[in-house]
C-alpha cells in the first residue's frame, strides 16, 4: 500500500515563507503585489473596497501602496483582525444588509478600486464548486457596479470552467479593457485566474439580467446547420485576362524596366527583359547572371528577383549621372558665344532637359523613399532598444524578488552610529551653512521615534565584553583570560575619564542640547552600569557582612576541633617523635594547603610550646639518635604506610583528608556494582589479589616496561560493555554542556545582537517612511544598515589543516574536509599571537 505524502507541507512554497518573514497575513498578498506591478491601479486610488478580505493580506498591501489619507474598507463573513487606517465589516456580500452597511460607511463616496479574492467552501464536485465561485464573482460585480466610480477598476478571481466565458462577456459590456492573467504567486496546479477590468463605463442603467445567474450562465443551444446552408448560393465573378491582352508571354525592354514606377509589379507581369541598349549592356553591373535571369523571369526565385531590382537601381544611378554631365556640357557650350551652334544645341538641350528633369524628380523621389526607409529603420531600432531595456528591467526585478530585495517589510541594519538624519554629524557652522534644504518635519519625526531611555555607558565596556566573549568561547585561552582579570578593573577605572572626554566632545557641537541635567544623566548611567548581569549576584552590604562573620565563626570552630583531636593523640606519641614530626620537611611538604594546613600547623606549634619545658637536656642524645633513624624516611612518600624504627616506636603520620576523585566510566560502572550487591563487592575485592598486580613504585621500573605491562597484563573488569557505555554516554552529555562562563558569554552575545537588531529595525523604519528619497536610495541605505550592524551574510566557515613537514606549498584537499580550508603551521600561529600582543600593547599605550 502506497504511503500518502503530506499535503500541507508541500504547499509551503517560497511565497508562504516570504509572507511569514515580511509580516503579511497570507501568501495571496504577493498576487496583488504582482498584479499592481503590472497594471498600476493602487497608486492612483483614493478609495478601495475589498470583498472577501479575510484574513487581511490584500488590505495590508492596499494600505502600503495607496496614498496615506485613502479610505480602505474590507468585508468578509468572518471577523478580520484590525489593521491601522482600515475599516473592516463582518457581512455577507450576497445580502442587502451588506449593501446598506457599505452605503453607511462610504456615505457619498465612490471607490476607485474593487477587489474580490473570494472563493466558496470547496469539497463537493468540481462542477458545483466552479459554479459557486462564478456565482460569488457575479455578486461581487453587482456590488462593484453600485459603488465603483467612472473609470474605476475591478479585480476578481475566477475559476477556469464553462461559466468563465459568460463572465468575461459581461465584464466586456461594463468595462473598456478586460484582461485575464495569472500572477507568478498563484500556484500552477490551481485553476484560478485573475481578471483585471479597467475603465468602468458607469452606465445610467444596468440590466438586472446581467446579475441573474440563471440568465448569465444559461446554456445556449446552437442549432446545427444543414448541408444546404453550408453551400454558398452566390456564384463567384469570373476573372479572365486583361482586355486586349491575347498572349501570356510579355516581352519588354530594359528602358521600360528603368522607367517603371513600381518595379515589383512590372516584374510580376513581364516574361522577358530585352537588353537592347548597347551602352547598358556593356555596363559592369550587367553580368552574365543578369542576362540569364532576364531571359525568363517567371521561373526566378526571391534571390534572383532581388538581384534584378538591385541591377535596376545601379543602372538608374548611372543614367542620372550621365544626364547631369550632359547638362553641364550644354551650359558650357551656351556660354561660349557660338550662336549658331547654340541654337542647334538649344534645340538638342530642349530635348535633353526634359529627361534630365524627370531624372531629377525620380532621384528626389528615391532620396525621399530612402529617407523614409531610414526613419522606419531608426524607429524599429528604437523600439527594439526600449524592448531590451524593459526586458532587462523585468529580469532585474525578478532577481530582486528572488533575492528578497524588493519586498515590503524587509529591513537591513544601521548606516551610522547616530542614524541617518542625526544632527550629530554636523560639526561647526561651516557644515551648518551647507545644509540649505531639507525636510525638517521628516527629521523631527525620525528623532521622535528614537529611543530616549537607551543610555550607553561607554564603548570601552563593549570592547571588553567582546574580548571576554572571544576568550570564553576559545577554551585554549581561558587560562590567559583568568590571569589578566586586572585589565577589566583598569578599564572600569578609566570609565569616568572616557565619559568626561565624550561630554567635552558633545559640548563642542553647538547644535545638540541635552534633554536632562548632568547630575540626573550621571545617576541614570550609574544605575544602568550596576544593573548588568555581572552585578546580579552581589547582595547588599548587610548580607555580605553577615556572610563574612559566619565564615569566620566556622573557621574558628574547625581550628578548635583539630586542636582537641591533636591533644587526644598526644599521649600515644613521644615528645621527640612529635618534635621530629613537626620539624620534618616530609610532613611540611605533604601538609594540606589552605585553611586546614594553616590550622594544623598552628596546632602543632602550640603543642610544641607547651611541652618544651618538660624536655631536659639529658635527652639530647636520644633525640639525635631518633633524627638519625628518621633520615632514611625523608623524601619518601607517605603512601607506603607506617614505619617502625630501631627502638620499636611506631610513627603514625597525620592523615590527609580524603581527596575528591573523579571516576571514569569504568570506575562508575564498578561503583554501581559495589553499591548494588554485597556479594559482588566481596567477589570484586577477592579478585583484586591476582598475578597481574604489583606494588612497585613508578620510579623503580623502566618506563617501557610499565607501558608494556599496561598493554598486555590487564585483567578484564567484571562489568559489561553496556554498563560502561551507559556511563560513557552520561559523561559525553555532561561534557557537551557548556561551562558557566561560556553560557554567560553566549547569553551576552545574544542580548547584544537582539539590542542591535531592535535599533536597526527602528532606523530602517525611519528610512522606509522617508518621502524625500527614491526607492533605489532607500534600498542602498537599508543595505548599508544591514552591513554595519553585522546582520548580513554569515561568515564563511574555514577548516584549518595543520601542514606537515616536507609537503611543500601545494596541499591537496584532505579526506573528509568540505568547503573552504586553510593550511596552517605552528610558526604561523605564533606569529599571529605575537601580532595580537603588539596590537594590545598599542591600544593600552593610546589609552
Curated annotation (Swiss-Prot):
Top-level taxon in the UniProt lineage: Eukaryota
Skewed-composition ranges (Basic residues): 811-821
Active site: 157 (proton acceptor)
Alphabetical list of Gene3D superfamilies matching this protein: Vaccinia Virus protein VP39
Annotated Pfam families: DUF3381, FtsJ, Spb1_C
Site of covalent link Glycyl lysine isopeptide (Lys-Gly) (interchain with G-Cter in SUMO2): 357, 579, 643, 659, 678, 710
GO biological process, one term: rRNA methylation
Catalytic activity: a ribonucleotide in rRNA + S-adenosyl-L-methionine = a 2'-O-methylribonucleotide in rRNA + S-adenosyl-L-homocysteine + H(+); a ribonucleotide in RNA + S-adenosyl-L-methionine = a 2'-O-methylribonucleotide in RNA + S-adenosyl-L-homocysteine + H(+)
Leading EC class: transferase
GO molecular function: RNA 2'-O-methyltransferase activity; RNA binding; rRNA (guanine) methyltransferase activity; rRNA (uridine-2'-O-)-methyltransferase activity
Biased composition (Acidic residues): 337-347, 358-367, 459-477, 500-509
Region annotation (Disordered) ranges: 332-370, 457-510, 558-653, 811-847
Annotated keywords: Citrullination, Coiled coil, Isopeptide bond, Methyltransferase, Nucleus, Phosphoprotein, Ribosome biogenesis, rRNA processing, S-adenosyl-L-methionine, Transferase, Ubl conjugation
GO cellular component, as recorded: chromosome; nucleolus; nucleoplasm; preribosome, large subunit precursor; preribosome, small subunit precursor
Location of the protein in the cell: Nucleus, Nucleolus
Subunit structure: Interacts with NIP7.
UniProt-recorded name of the protein: pre-rRNA 2'-O-ribose RNA methyltransferase FTSJ3
